[in-house]
Amino acid sequence: MGPLGRETWAQRLGTFRASPSAFMAGPEGEDLGRDLLSDLRSEKLSEPMKVALLALSLEYPDQLWPDAPAAEAAATSLLDTLVLLPPRPSALRRPLLLAATTALAAGGALNPASGASGRLLPLLLGLASGRDLGRSFCPASEQRPLQATAWECLRELESCRPGLLGGCLGLLRALLGREGPAQPLSLLLALALRNALVIQARAGAGLQGLLTAGESSMEGGPWNWMLAEEGEVHLQPQAPSWPAAEEDECGLAALELSPEEARELRATVAQLLDASYLLTPVAQAQLLWLLGWALRGLRGQPPVLFKPQLVRLLGTAQLTLLHAMLALKAAFGEALFTAQDEALLLRRLTLAAQHPALPLPTHLFYLHCLLNFPENWPLGPTGEEAAPLLLGSQLCRGLLPSLLHEPMALLARLHLLCLLCVEDEEKEGKGQDRSPRHYLEELLAGLRQRAALDGGPRALATLCFQASYLVAHCLAGQPVVLIPLTQGLAQLYRARPALAPHFVDLLDHVGPELQEPLRVALRQEVASRPGREEALRWHLQMLASVADGDAQSATLSFLRAAAAHCTDWGLQQALLRVCRALLRAGVGGGLADLLQELARQLEDPDGQDHARLYYILLAHLAGPKLGVALGPSLAAPALASSLVAENQGFAAALMVQEAPAPIRLSVGPRRAEGAVPVLRLQVEVLEPVYSLELRFRVEGQLYAPLGAVHVPCLCPGRPTRPLLLPLQPRRPAPARLAVRALYSTPSGLTCHAHLPPLLVAFADLFLPFPQPPEGAQLDFFEELWDSCLPKGTESRLWCPLGPEGLEALVSRHLEPFVVVAQPPVSYLVAIRLPPDSRLLLRLEAAQADGVPVALRTDDWAVLPLAGDYLRGLSAAG
């Protein structure tokens, strides 16, 4: 097949980028790499298109060259294409060099036996050293850009095979002196130096003249494959943290350097540092990190070499350089930073973090630096979290958290406040006004007050519990803080029981200092307040988490009172989960009576079976065996008896098991008819399902409880009628329906599964008004229009139209609700919104791109929903 055209390649590249894995698995995937390499030599494709093809090979080398032989062949072809380029200027030389390097590195083909490696490495070194390769290879105008690209390629290869350029250190050092402070060359030399030091230290050898060896003294070429084999562990040039001190002691500290090698090493580091100010901030930070790691723990190499850089960097506004400076401080401590330097740096971080115009990421960075500030002489055990000694409450007064801050900034400031509370514990005992602890208690009270708002955003509740966890983690040893925190959380649950899932999650993650008193407080709160019926499921969920052997009589009394209100399957299961928790806690006689009552009282057969099972287990098993029977199941042991196997299978058949749902449920097209809105549900199954029961729960209190939908049998491939789900909105607003399915399988098992939630849109609630008599439509609409005021509200907006115009839009979305129509420019629309609201629309004087809409409603809450609906009609099509 001949070369592909530009349009064909553009289509293939677009399809590939949309889903690389799917494209490579298709019929064209196998030929993509071969066609790419072939068409790079075609004269029919323009250079920009060829550059796009090379960019693809740089982004997805793993998909194009999945193994070492394919990568070797690709690199060879790319080098051949590079050599065959005409001597005129071309935009392909640099991408070809990068693509060949990427293919070898990503495909694992970089080794001494690779022919492509043997061709690429001398070429890169020749370009990097500025050697004249002849005008037939490239014009003089491209030599400087190609030299910078060669440096980048060599740095990539050194990153992939640490130690590969160990034999080139002397050459790179001489080249740096000749070329000046070129950024890629400086980073290449620093990386190669760091890797050589680490690998030689692990081998217990010195530098062996690597820093002074020139190109002429290299035997067998400049590539140190032996050193690269010893450095098989890929050292990351931008690791997020310094090596541990133990690694240094058994690593770089073991490197034996002769006086001449130590002198040459200091000269090389000084040469790199002296010109580092000419590099970009990111490159400077990387250079400092590499050299700091190279010298940390190395005997005979004083960190004073970095001192001139500190004088320059202490006043920097670049975050990357500030981070590198803190990394140097963590590495060398008081050997490099005096107490005055530490105080200056700490004060600068504190003042910078208080700047009101800082973006949130920058503000969080400064706070992170303060929270993890590396002190010269930290007090306390290693690894213990504490505020810096010089960071007092007066200096941090502007960093105290406030309810007005962003959540992430508030939590970071709260973390700092907790550390200050630990430091200022002694001062609080002396009657200090407005101590950090008092401020902390006021802040937590404000967070709880916002979280207690009924119907408030979930983010406020989440923030409150995140802050509570942070305080419990940082101040676990201070009862003076934990006692009011426990009381405040109990009051929060009393005000808003719907936060029970947050409380359960908090109890699972906090330590015993807060966990035990909070469990007791919440158990007392639940037992003393049975609550209304809608809060009962939250009380039962909380009690299942906090119930234990204490306060048995109060807990059992609450359960007996709650059993009368557990009328549906979900509440009954929640009640039985509490009984299971009490069983595991070893509660005895009173629980047996309760289980017998539940076996007679519960209406659902599944609940009755569970109650009888728990009663039998309680009556026949001792405490340890009962805990094992009710605990999480381990790997199933081999069954030695067929009777045991049969009994286990019988028990499994009686239990309702959770399983992945073989059911797909979706909302079908709506029909505006009847007295209440009805969702038409489309259901599909992947396997036969019998006695299907779909249970729906509305998130929030927007709708009245929904009834279950029953289907006797569903089989895959058979058409099914839509399932009708009547809705009873308490307010005309969209909602999410949580869906749970209970069904039987062909094997006789009863299973339950959670289905994806269904969304009830605002338009799903639309109902038409009764049809007025013929000829009275306009009077009927005007009467409705006038009746909306003064109780309701009126608004006007612009509704954009698609290319089909107003008549098509009304026909598609508003046809059942049109009272008066004068197509194609004017329509009067009346919509009834349950339970007792109305929405009236005047669409008049339509223009080509839109129509002005006047709307009235007798319910203020409907106005923003109606505006969003009308503005989205043209996009809905």
Swiss-Prot record:
Alphabetic keyword roster: Protein transport, Transport
GO cellular component: AP-type membrane coat adaptor complex
Superkingdom, natural source: Eukaryota
Pfam families documented for this protein: AP5B1_barrel (PF21589), AP5B1_C (PF21590), AP5B1_middle (PF21588), AP5B1_N (PF21587)
GO biological process, one term: protein transport
InterPro entries on file: AP5B1, AP5B1_barrel, AP5B1_C, AP5B1_middle, AP5B1_N
Function, in words: As part of AP-5, a probable fifth adaptor protein complex, it may be involved in endosomal transport.
PANTHER family listed in its UniProt record: AP-5 COMPLEX SUBUNIT BETA-1
Subunit structure comment from the entry: Probably part of the adaptor protein complex 5 (AP-5), a tetramer composed of AP5B1, AP5M1, AP5S1 and AP5Z1. Interacts with ZFYVE26 and SPG11.
Protein's UniProt name: AP-5 complex subunit beta-1
Organism listed in the record: Bos taurus (Bovine)
Gene: AP5B1
